[in-house]
């Protein structure tokens, strides 16, 4: 795509080397749509940097990523729960749930393992059908 754009003199936004497509949300390619939709790009980037700082902590209960990974390991490997559901109760958060599903599937689904299957659901829509099945 980039070579086509260069050949036809179409401007493009840079994606830093080593940044996979699913993480480009934090690059100019991902930040431009946020800005065009009126989102607060600076607040978004500050939030990402803040989470990165938290995820560098070495104390388990101060590191949300390590804590989530630990909980998921226990639920999956020790308890046998093979599905990881992200179910926001806001329609506005539906795309975040789907993005999380993509991140988990693409990051952990590359090799045959016992990783949980990620699933996105919407609270009020799915709680009366899927949630009943999961809780049975």
Regions found by a protein language model. Name each.
Residues 1-136:
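Active-site phosphate/pyrophosphate-binding segments
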């Amino acid at each position: 795509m980039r070579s086509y754009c260069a050949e036809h003199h179409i401007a493009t936004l840079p994606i830093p080397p080593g940044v996979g497509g699913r993480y480009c949300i934090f690059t100019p390619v991902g930040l431009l749509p946020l800005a065009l939709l009126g989102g607060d790009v600076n607040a978004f980037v500050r939030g990402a940097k803040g989470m990165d700082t938290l995820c560098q902590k070495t104390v388990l209960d101060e590191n949300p990523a390590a804590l989530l990974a630990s909980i998921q390991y226990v639920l999956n490997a020790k308890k046998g729960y093979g599905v990881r559901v992200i179910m926001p109760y806001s329609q506005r958060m539906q795309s975040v749930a789907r993005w999380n599903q993509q991140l988990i599937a693409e990051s952990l689904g590359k090799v045959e393992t016992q990783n949980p299957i990620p699933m996105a659901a919407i609270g009020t829509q799915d709680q009366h059908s899927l949630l009943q099945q999961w809780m049975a």
